[in-house]
Amino acid sequence: MIELVQNLLTEKFSEIEFNQEKHIYKVKSDEYISVTTILKQFVPEFDIEEISKRVSKKTGVSQEQIKQEWIEAGDNGREIGTALHKYIENNVSDLPYEKPNVQGSNLELLNKKINQFDKFKQEHLTGKEIVGSEIIIYDEDYKVAGTIDCLIYDPIKNIFWFVDWKSNKKISESNKWSTLLPPLQKYENSDYVKYSLQLSIYRYIVEKKIFKNIPNSENFINNSYNVIVNFPLNEDTYKIYFTNYMKFSIQQLLNLRLKKLQ
């Protein structure tokens, strides 16, 4: 099974080029939109000026200091997240660990997250097989592309795990103050929902281009898992979320994308 899926992934997604620095996907010189860019179109804009002003009034800290702290926290989070992704990619691919260019408190936090991943691996990956890591996929009809952090096969249940690694301070599971934009207005504007939509698009593309080319694939088409694994800053262990396959909702988004292309 693993070899068949790996061969199909290579065959069906072989024509893509990815510029990591600019985060641009191209297929046969056509630029494809990323899954994250599509989803951002349905997320209310974060008004840093207005929100930092409110926080400043509430806390007594100057607005400029608050904004600067947010910028620094974002930069540090990206540095740690990039290094963690690289460690996990090498680990699950049985490649040697490359010492990251991370120093000081960020290195301390990175090592903590590495320990969290090692614990996750021990508790959840035993007996499972890694199909691939950092798998770039795309769909020619919608001209959309993205990268699956990790695809895992469970031979006992005959299902796949579509995994997204996160290193957030915390994943918001609800947001009673804000919803996504139409046609997704029934969903709260939370990390959980946005990551679930992202994984659902990845799964839909793989289902369409890979799984449907495999005989007797009904079980893993219907029963595979979409999984968010977060390695939070302020906790000692990982947190795992098995999310819904939001197939109908992402079909709505992709159909809107198709109309724009016509």
Model regions and ranges:
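Short, solvent-exposed loop/turn segments at secondary-structure junctions
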Residues: Y138, S167-K170, F231-L233
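A generic structural motif
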Residues: Y138, Y153, V227-V229
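Nuclease catalytic cores
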Residues: M1-D141, A145
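Short histidine-centered catalytic/ligand-binding loop motif
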Residues: A73, V102-N106, L181-V193
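Metal-dependent nuclease catalytic regions and adjoining charged, substrate-binding loops involved
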Residues: N189-S196, S200-Q262
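Conserved catalytic cores of phosphodiester-cleaving nucleases, focusing on short active-site segments
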Residues: H85, I148-D154, I159-N175, T179-L180, ...
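Gram-negative outer-membrane beta-barrel domains
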Residues: E140-D141, N175, P182-Q185
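Short, mixed charged/polar active-site loops
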Residues: K143-A145, N158-F160, T237-I240
